[in-house]
C-alpha cells in the first residue's frame, strides 16, 4: 500500500540533511531563578516557522513542549520581517502601480490617485499581527508552553532562559531542538542603520519613498524589494555580482526573461558587478563598484541602499561551544540525516543548519524531526522543495534547472508553453512569461519545472506534487485541466515536452 511505502521511506540523503531530536524538560515562567520539577519531552529554542511548527506538531502528538522565543512574537523572520510583510507590500504596491499605469486600456478610468504610505504600512502590520496571534492560539490549543525570552544551553539537558520581562528560569528536556533561524549577512564596511543603509527589515518599514533606491544583491529578496519601491516611485538600481539575477538556483532562461521584464518596468540592473566599498554622505550614500572581472571603478549615488546579499545561520549566544555542538565553516549546525547533532538528543532544523533558507523547507523539517523523536521515522524530499519569487510576473520552480542537468551530464528534453497563447492570461491582459518542463528523454519522468508568469507561485504546487510522485510529462498532459485557466499552460507545456502542444 502507498501509505506503507511512505511510512517506510527515510529522509533523503542530500548535501544538506542531518537529523535527530531530543526530549526536553520545561521550566515554569513563574518560577524565575529555579529549575522546574517536571521534564519536558521537547524544549525548542526559537519560535520561528521551524520552531513553532515543531511545537504544534509535538503538542498534537501528546508531548509536553516548551517553546522559547526572544522576539516577543512568534513566527520568526518569515512572519514578522520577511515572507508575510513583504507579500503585503508586494500585493498592495502592485495594485497601486496597476491603478496608475494599467487600468485605462482595460476600460477603467480613475481620478487622482494618491499613495498613503502610512496606511500601506498599517495594512502590512495588521496582517502580521493577526497571524502571530493565531500561532499563540494554536499553542494554547495544543498545550504548548511559550516562554518569551532568550535561551542558551547550561548543559546538554538544561536551557537557561533570560525572560523578556525580567528574571530568568531554567528548562530541562529529554529532547532539545535548535530552531534559531538566520540573520542578515552584513556587507563589510557598510554599517546598517535601517535609515540610509538598510537590511530587508528596514526595506519593509521605510517612512518615505526614496528618490533613488540602490539594491546590493539581485537575489529573490533584493528583487522583491526593488519591485516594491520601484512601483511606489523610486528610481531603482540593482547591483549583482553574478551574471544573472535571481540567484544561482534560478534557471538561466527564466532569469534572462524576468530581467527583461523588470527592466521594462523601470528597474535598472548592473550584473557582473562588484561592490568595492561605500560611504554615507550628507543626505545619502555613495557606492563604488566595478566589473566583477575587473575594470574601471564607477560611483553610484542613492538616498537609500538595501544590503540584500543573503542570510547566515543565527546561533550567537546559544552556548553551543559549552556543550560541544559543532558548526561548519559557514556557521551551520552540523547534523545527521535525522537532524541529530553530535549529542543525539539535541537536534537542529531550519535556517540554522543545512539547505535552502526557505520557510516551507523549515516547516517540512519541523514535522519530520518530531516524527523522528516520537515514532523513529520521518521524511523530507529535498529534491522537491519549490522556490518562488513574488515579483510581477511571479517566478517559481521546483527540481533541477537546465544548467544543473548540463553540469551533471544528465540528458533531458525540454517543453515550453507561453502565457501569450493561454486564453485566461489573454483575457486578464497578463500574458508575459511561460511554463518550462524538463524530462528524462527515455522514461519521460519530470526532472524540473520552471514558471514565469501570473500566479506562478500557486501553479508550482502542481509541479511539486508531480515530482514528488515521479510523474511523467505525459501523466500531466493526459490530466484534464479546467478551461479557461492559467493552469492549462502547465498542461500544454507537458504536452510540448513529450509530444506537441495544441494551442501553440
Swiss-Prot record:
It comes from the Eukaryota. InterPro entries: Class-I_Pyr_Nuc-Dis_Oxidored, FAD/NAD-bd_sf, FAD/NAD-binding_dom, FAD/NAD-linked_Rdtase_dimer_sf, Lipoamide_DH, Pyr_nuc-diS_OxRdtase, Pyr_nucl-diS_OxRdtase_dimer, Pyr_OxRdtase_I_AS. Residues 1-34 form a transit peptide. Keywords: Disulfide bond, FAD, Flavoprotein, Mitochondrion, NAD, Nucleotide-binding, Oxidoreductase, Redox-active center, Transit peptide. GO terms for cellular component: mitochondrion; oxoglutarate dehydrogenase complex. GO terms for biological process: 2-oxoglutarate metabolic process. Its cofactor is FAD. The record marks 444, 469 as: Important for interaction with PDHX and activity of multienzyme pyruvate dehydrogenase complex. Disulfide bonds join 78-83. NAD(+) binds at residues 217-224, 240, 275, 310. FAD binds at residues 69-78, 87, 151, 180-182, 351, 357-360. Binds 1 FAD per subunit. Pfam families: Pyr_redox_2, Pyr_redox_dim. Eukaryotic pyruvate dehydrogenase (PDH) complexes are organized as a core consisting of the oligomeric dihydrolipoamide acetyl-transferase (E2), around which are arranged multiple copies of pyruvate dehydrogenase (E1), dihydrolipoamide dehydrogenase (E3) and protein X (E3BP) bound by non-covalent bonds. The Chaetomium thermophilum PDH complex contains 60 E2 units, 12 E3BP units, about 20 E1 units, and 12 or more E3 units. The units are organized in 1 E2 60-mer, 4 E3BP trimers, about 20 E1 tetramers, and a maximum of 12 E3 dimers. Lipoamide dehydrogenase is a component of the alpha-ketoacid dehydrogenase complexes. This includes the pyruvate dehydrogenase complex, which catalyzes the overall conversion of pyruvate to acetyl-CoA and CO(2). Also acts as a component of the glycine cleavage system (glycine decarboxylase complex), which catalyzes the degradation of glycine. This is Dihydrolipoamide dehydrogenase. It comes from Chaetomium thermophilum (strain DSM 1495 / CBS 144.50 / IMI 039719) (Thermochaetoides thermophila).
